[in-house]
C-alpha cells in the first residue's frame, strides 16, 4: 500500500522540501528522467485566494530535485478555458521561480496533442504530459461547486487542450476525470492544502489549514482529501470510479499515513471571507491552530448544507486548555468541558457528527 506523508507549517518551500526528503523521492526517479511538474494555475489569481498552487511548492520541489542531481525539469500547465496561462503564471510568481532555477515553463494550450483510448472514450491529451518520464502532480486541495472536491485527479484536467476540457463538462465531469486518471497517472503527488477554498475552484473563501501532503497514489490521496474535508467517497464519485478503472486504490489504513509534525499556530493569516465570518459568528477562538479551526469551518459549512442547527456558542483554541467549559469544545485543548470533540486536530466529519447528535 502507498504511504501518505503529512506535514504542517507556514513555509510552502521548506514543507515541500521536507516532504520529498522524508519520502526519499530521489530513489523513485530513474536516472536522466525528464520530470514534469504540474501545478494548479486554474486562473489568474494569487494562491492566498485558495485557488492556485503556492509558488513555494514549486520552488521547494525544483530545489530538491536539482540538489539530488536531476536537471531535466520543466513546469507544464494550462489555465481553464477563458483565462490566459501566462497571465496566471505571473500572478502566482511562477515566472520568477522558473527564472531563478533555470527551469522552462510550457503552456499546454500551445502543446501538441495525442489521442489516447480510455475506459470512457478516446481522449485528447497534451504530449508533454504524456511523454514525461516522471510526472509530479502539484494540486490544491479545495472545494468545488460541481464535484464537491478537487485535488490530484481533477488537477490532471489541466493537461488537456481547451476543446477536450469543454467535452469534460458536457460529459458531466465524473466519468472523464476518472478515465483520465487511469491513463495519465502521476508518479508523485504533492498537495498544497495550505489555504484551499471552502467550496469553489476559483477561490474566494480560503480556509487556512497550513498543511501539505505527499503520496504516490492519486486515488488514495483524493480519498484522504475527502476525509480531511469531511466528505464521503460517495460525495465525490469520480474517485471510486477511477479506482475501478485502475487509477489507484481508495484504501487507507492507519499506518498508511505518516504525520511528520503537529499543527502549530503563530502565522498571520489572511482576513476571513464574508462567508467564513458568517459561519463562525458563534465561535470563540482563543489561540486556535489553523488546522483545528479549518476543520471546524468545514464542518460548519457542511452543517449549513444539511440544514443542521449548530450550537449558538462554540469554543476552540489552546487558551481553553485546563479550563472548565460549558459550551461545545473543539479539539483536545477543550477537554475540560463536558462536551468536546476529540482530536488534534479533529476531523470535519467528527465535528459534524457531534452537530448531528445535538440536533
Model-assigned labels for residue ranges:
Residues 1-359:
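N-terminal and secondary-structure boundary signal
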Amino acid at each position: 500500500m502507498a504511504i501518505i506523508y503529512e506535514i504542517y507549517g507556514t513555509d510552502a518551500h521548506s514543507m515541500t522540501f521536507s516532504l520529498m526528503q522524508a519520502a526519499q523521492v530521489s530513489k523513485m526517479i530513474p536516472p536522466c528522467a525528464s520530470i514534469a511538474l504540474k501545478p494548479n494555475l486554474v486562473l489568474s489569481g494569487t494562491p492566498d485566494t485558495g485557488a492556485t498552487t503556492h509558488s513555494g511548492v514549486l520552488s521547494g520541489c525544483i530545489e530538491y530535485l536539482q540538489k539530488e542531481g536531476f536537471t531535466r525539469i520543466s513546469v507544464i500547465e494550462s489555465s481553464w478555458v477563458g483565462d490566459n496561462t501566462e497571465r496566471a503564471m505571473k500572478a502566482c510568481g511562477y515566472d520568477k521561480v522558473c527564472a531563478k532555477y533555470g527551469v522552462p515553463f510550457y503552456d499546454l494550450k500551445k502543446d501538441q496533442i495525442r489521442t489516447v483510448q480510455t475506459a470512457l472514450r478516446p481522449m485528447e491529451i497534451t504530449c508533454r504530459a504524456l511523454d514525461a518520464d516522471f510526472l509530479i502532480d502539484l494540486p490544491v486541495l479545495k472545494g468545488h461547486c460541481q464535484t464537491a472536491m478537487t485535488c490530484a485527479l481533477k488537477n490532471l484536467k489541466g493537461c488537456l487542450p481547451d476543446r477536450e476540457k469543454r467535452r469534460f463538462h458536457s460529459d458531466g465531469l465524473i466519468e472523464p476525470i476518472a478515465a483520465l486518471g487511469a491513463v495519465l497517472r502521476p508518479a508523485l503527488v504533492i498537495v498544497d492544502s495550505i489555504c484551499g477554498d471552502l467550496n469553489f475552484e476559483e477561490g474566494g473563501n480560503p480556509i487556512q489549514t497550513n498543511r501539505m501532503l505527499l503520496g504516490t497514489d492519486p486515488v488514495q490521496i483524493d480519498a484522504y482529501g475527502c476525509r480531511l474535508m469531511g466528505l464521503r467517497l460517495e460525495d465525490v464519485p469520480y474517485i471510486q470510479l477511477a479506482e475501478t478503472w485502475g487509477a489507484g486504490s481508495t484504501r487507507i489504513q492507519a499506518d498508511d499515513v505518516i504525520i511528520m509534525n503537529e499543527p502549530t499556530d503563530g502565522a498571520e493569516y489572511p482576513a476571513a471571507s464574508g462567508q467564513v465570518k458568517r459561519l463562525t459568528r458563534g465561535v470563540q477562538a482563543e489561540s486556535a491552530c489553523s488546522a483545528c479551526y479549518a476543520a471546524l469551518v468545514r464542518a460548519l459549512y457542511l452543517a449549513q448544507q444539511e440544514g443542521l442547527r449548530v450550537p449558538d456558542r462554540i469554543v476552540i483554541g489552546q487558551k481553553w486548555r485546563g479550563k472548565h467549559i460549558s459550551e461545545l469544545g473543539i479539539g483536545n485543548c477543550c477537554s475540560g468541558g463536558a462536551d468536546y470533540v476529540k482530536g488534534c486536530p479533529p476531523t470535519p466529519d467528527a465535528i459534524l457528527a457531534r452537530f448531528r447528535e445535538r440536533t
